[in-house]
Amino acid sequence: MSAQNLLVEIGTEELPPKALRKLAEAFAANLTAELETLELAHQGVSWYASPRRLGLRVIALDAKQQDKEVEKRGPAIKAAFDADGNPTKAAMGWARGCGIEVKDAQTLETDKGAWLLHLAKVAGQETKTLMVDVINKALAKLPIPKPMRWGANKTQFIRPVHTVTILLGDELVTGEVLGKQVSNQLQGHRFHHPEKITINHADDIFDVLKSAYVIADYEQRKAQIRAQIEAAAKAINAVVAMDEDLLEEVTSLVEWPVTLTATFEEEFLAVPAEALIYTMKDDQKYFPLLDQNGKLLNKFLFVSNIESKDPSVVISGNEKVVRPRLADAQFFFESDKKKTLESRLESLDSVLFQKQLGTLKDKSARISELAGYIAQQLGADKELAQRAGLLSKTDLMTEMVMEFTDIQGVMGMHYARFDGEAEDVALAQNEQYMPRFAGDSLPTNLISCAVAIADKFDTLVGIFGIGQAPKGDKDPFALRRAAIGALRIMVEKELPLDILDLVAKSQTLFGDKLTNLNVSTDVFEFMLGRFRAWYQDEGIEVDVIQAVLARRPTKPVDFDRRVKAVSHFRTLDAAEALAAANKRVSNILAKNDITSEGNVDESLLTDDAEKVLAAQVAKFATELAPLYASGNYQEALSQLAGIRQSVDSFFDNVMVMADDEAVKQNRLALLSQLSGLFLGIADISVLQK
C-alpha cells in the first residue's frame, strides 16, 4: 500500500505566544490519536508553529485503511430456529441487516453456547476522504480556554483563521475546516511577504515558507535566535544571561528573527539592576546584557520580526519604547527611598492576608515571633531574625513593587540596605521567598532561613487551621510549594528543627483565630506527603520511603538521614534476608500482642542459637546507641547487617512458640528487642526485593 507525507497548516492571526508550543503539541497528539483510532499507519507526527500558523507533518501516512473483516454476531442458535428448524423472525431480520440469507450464516461456538455469525468484509476508506473530519476533530480538542468568533462565521477558534492547507503528497485534500475551504495557499511573513504563496507538495513546506520570510520549524528558529543573541553579545564583549522562558516566548513572537543591539542612558543604572532587568525582560521582551563581572550594562538585545534596510530606525524605536519604562522605575525607586520600610508597617494593616487570619501586619508580627524562635534554636541572632521578619512584607507597600510585583523581596533588600538595616536583615527580605521554584537556590544564612521557614509555616498552619487544605489541583495559597520549600531548607541546610514543635509555636501566635482542632496532625501529614513526593521525584524507591514513614520522624533532617541510610542498606547482601526476618518477627509479635520491648532472662536461654542472638542484640544495643543519638543511621544499619547469620540460625534452630510459657515469653522478648534495633531507624520489614 502506497504511503504519502501529509501536511496540515492552519494560518491564523497572531497566536498567544505563551500558549503556542502547548497548542502545537496538543494538535500533534490529537491527530496521532485520531489516526490510531482509524488504524491509519504512519511513521510519525511532528509539529511546527510560528505566530501565525499551526502546522503538522505526518511521515509516510498510508493512502487508505486496510480492508478488514468485522464479526457481526446474530441471535443464539436456540432463538434463531423454531422447533421445525425454520429461521425465526429474529434470525431473518438479522440476516437481512447483514445483506445475506440465514442459510449463508456461519456458526460461532463458545463456552456459553452457539450463535449465528457473519464475517463482513469492510473495505478500507481512502485517507484523503477521512482527513477533513480527522483534522476538525483534532482541532476541536485543543486546550483553548476562551475561543473566539470572527466576522459572520459561527466557527470558534483561539484566533481568526485565514488559511487551511491539507496536502497528501502533491494531492490537495478538499473540504472545509474551521469555516474555511481547504486550499494550497499559505500565509507568508506579514510584512516581507504579505501576498499568499502556493505550495504544491507537502514535502516543500519549509522551503516554500522560507522563501516567504518564515522560519517555520520552531526549534530551528529558537536555535537561530539563541545563536544570534550569543554572537551579538560576544561582539561587544558582553554576556547575556540567557532566560529560557524569555527565549521560548520570543521564538513564539517572530517568524523571521533579526537580533539587534540597543542602548539606554547610563543614569538609569543607579536603579537596582533587578528592576531594570524585570522591565526589559517582562515588559519589553528584551535580553539585558552584563559585563564580564556580571554587572548590568546600559545595553540590551532585542529580536525584531523584520529585516530592515535601516536597522538604526528599528533600534531607535525600541530605545524610545524602553526609555519611559526605565524612567518609571527610576521615579519609583527615588520616591520609595523617601520612606523607610519601618514607616510602612502601619500601612500593612490595610491589606488583608486572609479574612479569618488578619492583615499583612498581623502576619508580619507572627513571622517576626516565629523567626526569632527558630533563630534561637539554630544559635542565630534572635533580634535580627525578629527584625527581618517584622519588615518582611513592607516592600509590598512600595510603588516599585506595586508596579513590578515579581520583584518583591529583592526591592525590600535594596530598601533595607538604603535604610541602614543590618546586612542579614536586608538579605532576608529577598531570601524569605526562597526557594521560589523547583531547583531554586536556598537562603544563604541562618537569619534568612529562619524568616523563610517562619513565613512558610505561618501560611501552612494558618490555612490548615481554618480548614482550607488543598483539594485536587486547587492550591490557591501555594501550600505545596510552601511545604516543600520549608522541607528543602531544613534538609539541605541540615537544620535540626522539629515540624510538630514549629506547628505548635505557630498555633499559639494565631490566638483564637484557628478553628481546626486537628491542625497539628493535618500539617504534619501534609508535610510527610510532600516528603514522599520529593523523594519519589529523586528516584528513591517507594518501599524505602514507606519504611521511614512508618517511624514518623518529626525532624526533616533526621527523616532525610534515615531515608539515605535505608537506601544504602537495601544495597547490602544481608538486606533481603533481614527484611524478610523482620517481617516474620513483626507478624509473630503482632499475633502475640507484643507492643513493647520486654526484658530477656538469660537463665531461660537454653538453645545455643538463641544465646548467640541474645548476646549480639545486647551488644548492638550498647554499641549502636551513640550512632542513633548522633543520627548516623547509615553506619548503624551497616553494622546491624552483621546480625543476619545469628537471626537465620535462630529461626532455623529455635521454636519461638515453646510449650513452656516462660521460655516462649522470653523468646518473644528477645525478638522484640531485635525488632527494636531496626525500628530505631525504620521499619525494614516493608522493604521488597
UniProtKB/Swiss-Prot annotation:
GO MF annotations, alphabetized: arginine-tRNA ligase activity; ATP binding; glycine-tRNA ligase activity
SMART domains, per database record: DALR_1
PROSITE patterns for the chain: AA_TRNA_LIGASE_II_GLYAB
Summary of subunit composition and partner proteins: Tetramer of two alpha and two beta subunits.
Example GO BP: glycyl-tRNA aminoacylation
DNA damage as UniProt keyword: no
Organism field: Pseudoalteromonas translucida (strain TAC 125)
Keywords: Aminoacyl-tRNA synthetase, ATP-binding, Cytoplasm, Ligase, Nucleotide-binding, Protein biosynthesis
InterPro entries: DALR_anticod-bd (IPR008909), Gly-tRNA-synth_bsu (IPR015944), Gly-tRNA-synth_heterodimer (IPR006194)
Main location: cytoplasm
Similarity annotation: Belongs to the class-II aminoacyl-tRNA synthetase family.
GO cellular component: cytosol
Gene from which the chain derives: glyS
Enzyme nomenclature, EC number: 6.1.1.14
Localization in the cell: Cytoplasm
Reactions catalysed: tRNA(Gly) + glycine + ATP = glycyl-tRNA(Gly) + AMP + diphosphate
Pfam family, one: DALR_1
Tagged with keyword Protein biosynthesis: yes
Protein name: Glycine--tRNA ligase beta subunit
